[in-house]
Amino acid sequence: MAVWREPKPLILASQSRVRQALLANAGLSFEAIPAAIDERAIQRSCGLTSGAEIAVRLACEKARYVSLRSPGRYVIGADQTLECDGRLFNKPDGRVGAAEHLRALSGRTHALHAAVAIVRDGRQLFEYVSVARMTMRELSEDTIEAYLNAAGDEVTASVGAYQLENLGVHLFSRVEGDHFSILGLPLLPLLAFLRSQGLLSL
């Protein structure tokens, strides 16, 4: 059952299969159009140092980029950032980078910020950011090697080199935060906003 009331579907400015699945499972009609932006260049030039603020900025920029090329459409942008011991992590560069990420996060608690924004005709209508506290268990070199062998290259698409919805769940001893946000999309606040605008039938 589709609950989206507008004649034209939403646009998700992301190629993330997990975010697409979350929207589809919630009954939202949408199409995915990834934003062709340089995330690291924006991050360097924006002058922001907080992981939460950077996540919001990137979510907004993704949505704005696609919105300006899609008149009249509601566009969702989303982003995640990870902070651990004062260090801001980017998506790992290949398997070697993923292993380095996991070594740095092993035995520590990190903050995972998930942001979502909605833009229409270049105008930002909504933004939200949440934080989850993720405690990774102590990982041996053998465990890291075995995990990367089993999980494959897909882990490099995640800022923390793990996917909690898959084998990444084995890496953690404690997780505190909203499940949807950890997967990459603060879904409940997003749905609440769309509902408040009369855009959903439920």
Swiss-Prot record:
Catalytic activity: a ribonucleoside 5'-triphosphate + H2O = a ribonucleoside 5'-phosphate + diphosphate + H(+); a 2'-deoxyribonucleoside 5'-triphosphate + H2O = a 2'-deoxyribonucleoside 5'-phosphate + diphosphate + H(+)
Molecular function per GO: nucleoside triphosphate diphosphatase activity
Subcellular location: Cytoplasm
Names of the cofactor(s): a divalent metal cation
A Pfam family per the record: Maf
Domain of life: Bacteria
Family: Belongs to the Maf family.
Function description: Nucleoside triphosphate pyrophosphatase. May have a dual role in cell division arrest and in preventing the incorporation of modified nucleotides into cellular nucleic acids.
Protein name: Nucleoside triphosphate pyrophosphatase
Organism field: Nitrobacter hamburgensis (strain DSM 10229 / NCIMB 13809 / X14)
